[in-house]
Amino acid sequence: MLKLQKKLKNDYGLVFNDEYLLKTAFTHSSFTNEERLPKIANNERLEFLGDVALSLVISDYLYRTYPEKLEGELSKMRSSIVRTESLANFSRSCGFGEFLRLGHGEEKMGGRDRETTLENLFEAFLGALFIDQGMDEVRKFIQHVVIPHVKNDDYVKVIDYKTELQEVLQIGGETTISYKILKEEGPAHDRSFVAAVFNNGKELGRGLGKSKKVAEQKAAENAIKGQNHVS
């Protein structure tokens, strides 16, 4: 962790008060499983917290920066910024994958550069930073790493199929859209999910993805295309 701490200080001016918290953020579930450590020692709880912190900071930034955009447009932008591929790229740009503690099996399967793993790592780091130093530091970090891409309009044109589907269906009147994970397959380090999207109880489409978020987006995309099958 010393190399990571040095990198954080040099690149972002960050010095963690709680080194164990930082280590936990960079500990994958495959590592705790192989080492027979308590499940609470992996980064999943921190990921949960970081996801909320990230969404709040991005929402606040978009609201203040784009006063002319309506709620639907802001939601599309936020969704494109916090989607799996985007967060994985932010994690790569920070060089976080190098410091992730993985199980040997996960390492051999290419887990160090897996999109969902890097997404979760980025969110876990934000969660750890929030606990260690508060929301202001989380905001500063996001301003440094994420916001420059937003300013370049990198995410304005990215399609959020869930939002698009909702807008299409609302044209026809009253609608209640819901998503359900129908199936989970594969080992813990390489899961696949099948999601279905429903409108007023009627299934419209299914999608396959390496995360629940991706599977739901794919289901929405297939629903828009009128393809009621998994792809």
Swiss-Prot record:
GO biological process, alphabetically ordered: mRNA processing; regulation of gene expression; rRNA processing; tRNA processing
PROSITE patterns, sorted: DS_RBD, RNASE_3_2
GO cellular component labels: cytoplasm
Root EC class: hydrolase
Location of this chain's protein in the cell: Cytoplasm
DRBM domain: residues covered: 160-229
Names of required cofactors: Mg(2+)
Active site residues per record: D51, E123
All residue ranges annotated as the RNase III domain in the record: 5-134
UniProt family annotation: Belongs to the ribonuclease III family.
Subunit structure, as described in the record: Homodimer.
Function field: Digests double-stranded RNA. Involved in the processing of primary rRNA transcript to yield the immediate precursors to the large and small rRNAs (23S and 16S). Processes some mRNAs, and tRNAs when they are encoded in the rRNA operon. Processes pre-crRNA and tracrRNA of type II CRISPR loci if present in the organism.
Protein name in the entry: Ribonuclease 3
